[in-house]
Amino acid sequence: MSEEHIYPVTDNLAKNSLLTNEEYLTQYQASISDPSAFWGEKGKILDWIKPYTKVKNSSFDSGHVSIKWFEDGKLNVSANCIDRHLATKGDQVAILWEGDTADKDEKITYKQLHQRVCQFANVLKSQGVRKGDVVCLYMPMTPEAAVAMLACTRIGAVHSIVFGGFSPDAIAGRIVDSSAKIVITADEGRRGGRVVPLKANVDEALTKDGTDCVKSVIVFKNTGGEVNWVVGRDLDWESVCADESSECEPEAMNAEDPLFILYTSGSTGTPKGVLHTTGGYLVYAAMTFKYVFDYQEGDIYWCTADVGWITGHTYSVYGPLANGATSLIFEGVPNYPTPARMSEVVDKHKVSILYTAPTAIRALMAKGDQAIEGTHRSSLRILGSVGEPINPEAWEWYYNKIGDERCPIVDTWWQTETGGILISPLPGATDLKPGSATRPFFGVQPAIVDSEGVVLEGEAAGNLVMLDSWPGQMRTLYNNHDRFEQTYFSTFKGMYFTGDGARRDSDGYYWITGRVDDVLNVSGHRMGTAEIESALVSHPKIAEAAVVGVPHEIKGQGIYAYVTLNEGEYPSPELYAEVKQWVRKEIGAIATPDILHWAEGLPKTRSGKIMRRILRKIATGESDSLGDISTLADPSVVEQLIKENRETS
């Protein structure tokens, strides 16, 4: 193997895991040489109401992009995640809930989950929700979020979850785009000792133009905090559930019926509604969960992601429950009230598989041994990382400290658009290299291409693409198939472009090098630079703005904003604070710029295009390697920006 630090699979791990290296290689080869035969067999991981006869039907051709899997089969997601486990696992815990503070927790068995999901599905029906209708969720990390998701799938409604940290404007935009019929929320959320005004944000969102598609708001009383109540529109979760039966027949859904919409940031500013469908998504969620985490009966699994992100959808709810696992849902943050909180939760619930983000790992690493103080973490056997590439130093710390030098780390690479993990080690099959996502999952055909789209062989670096479809792939952008083709299939013809750069080493391992488009990855969450820029320029004192990503030791990427003020306006500490607060209000705390650089002008080409490449170099202090600047309309602007950057840093 090449020179990086290697962690080989131990004999014991290989012996006790679901797959060895030889089995992986054999199955992987089968999955790409005959995808229909491979997935035709693997699709049986689910229960089908009407078995499929067709497996794969996909095309990445320009103007004809179409993705279908198991298209003549019928199934129900909630039945696969709950009902089929009732006979053998009715009394097993399905959802373990841990509150923001250690004095709040709850255990929900599969039997209890079935009852709650059926009741809430009947509530949705009584509110006029039908198959294909969109339901918007803006929820805290409580079991009710999973109940609401599963209730939607039971009756064939399409859920659209908005992350609980997003602003009223962001909620409204997603409601309008999806024509949501109902909003499900809570009075307030709790996170890291703070209270999040969920209901108040929904109330404000529903004052915006175009949100009159919403007929009712169902409110779960989470904190008991006082909220505004709109008579005739707002309904109390507990009261409406009490009137409903705890039986609800699951709707038979076609494999290609929509399952959920999840909005993700694009480089053009308007969020994109990624659409996943029922059959292929759930097959892929179930398969990847089982093999990537080497899931075995009795495991207690904890994915720390919020359900507002794709990781929470696939690996907190659908993947684990489809496998009949026990999934821990956590309301808090890994370092509150003390840096040892994550390790304490592991010990309290005997967590055996832990899936978290490099941001959390780096934040804990900064606290050193405080992160593990008073804990033993002896229940852990598998660690996972998700959201962004993990730097080798953080990987080693995670392995040595949290995992006690005995738990393999699955460093998973995937996206909202991919539905599930595409590149990852498999615990008993893959020798590990800190910082590498290693090898593709079954059926996944990655390639590295140069800027012309030429496929590079062997050791190479360039743009990461996928050459063929896999069952969990998104099908389209909601109500915008043209934008879907334009965004993902126009850069490199006949290939799915991930937007990420990667290199492949001499062992065929993939190393993700980060975004190659105008999308930031802040704390593992994607945000379009254009989205933040449009929030900035909507401030009455700002004329122009350009946003770039800069390295950040905790968040991975920080947000560096160049801001040009209107004539007659001048920088001040007060305005600095006001502008940061403005962005928080417009988008959410996660989009708050780390640095504002007051700029008299921005570097532009003669055609008026802002040269972000140059702004990135200046922001990261690489002003001695700006590259070709011959197309600049006014080179003196660059000199001024470099001078200002040096003065402030």
Swiss-Prot record:
The name of this protein is: Acetyl-coenzyme A synthetase
Q: Which cofactor does it need?
A: Mg(2+)
Q: Which reaction does it catalyse?
A: acetate + ATP + CoA = acetyl-CoA + AMP + diphosphate
Q: Which GO terms describe its molecular function?
A: acetate-CoA ligase activity; AMP binding; ATP binding; metal ion binding
Task: Enumerate the UniProt keywords alphabetically.
Answer: Acetylation, ATP-binding, Ligase, Magnesium, Metal-binding, Nucleotide-binding
Binding residues for ATP, per the UniProt record?
A: 387-389, 411-416, 500, 515, 526
Q: Which residues bind CoA?
A: 191-194, 311, 335, 523, 584
